[in-house]
Amino acid sequence: MSSTFSFDVVSKLDMQEFDNALNQAKKELQQRYDLKNTNSSIEFNQKDMQLTLESADEFSLKSVVDIIESKMIKRGISIKSLDFGKVEPASQKSVRQKISLKEGIDKENAKKITNAVKDMKLKVQASVQGEEVRISGKSKDELQTVMSALKEMDLPVPLQFTNYR
C-alpha cells in the first residue's frame, strides 16, 4: 500500500450563497424602519468583485454593514472574505464605503500554512500551487490531523478543503 493521499486547501467564495445573502440584505434594507430616510444602498460590481455601500451618515452605514455581515453568517459565508475600505464622503452629505471580496490564498498566507504543516513534524508535504496549497501524505489520519490544525489557525482568509483523495 504505497499510494499517497492528498487534499487542497483553498479560499473560495460561494458566489450563489453570496448573491442570496446580498439579496436578503437588500430586502431588509428596504424594510428597516431606522434606515427609511437614509438613502442607503448596496451595489455589487461582479467584474471587480466589489461592494459599494452608500448611506446618509456613518451610523446608518455601520447598520448596513451589520446587515450584510449577519446575512452572510446565516448563509454560511465567512466574513473574513470581506476587505473593508475607508469610509469616504460622497455627494449630498452622504458617505460611501467600498468592500472588496477576497478569493484565493496569497503567497504570504500560503507560506504560513506550509510552515505550520512543516512545524507539525508529521510525514506530510505541503506545496503551493498558485492560489491553493496541496497537502499530501501516506496516512489519512495524518492528513486529518493537519486539517483540524489548519481549521484552528487564525488566518485572515477563510479556508476550505477540496479534492480529498
Curated annotation (Swiss-Prot):
GO terms for molecular function: nucleotide binding. Keywords: Nucleotide-binding. The keyword Nucleotide-binding applies. It holds the Pfam family DUF520. SUPFAM superfamilies: YajQ-like. One of its GO terms (cellular component) is cytosol. Gene3D superfamilies: 3.30.70.860, YajQ-like, domain 2 (3.30.70.990). It comes from the Bacteria. Belongs to the YajQ family. PANTHER family: UPF0234 PROTEIN YAJQ. Nucleotide-binding protein. NCBIfam families: PRK05412.1 (NF003819). This is Nucleotide-binding protein Ctha_0558. It comes from Chloroherpeton thalassium (strain ATCC 35110 / GB-78).
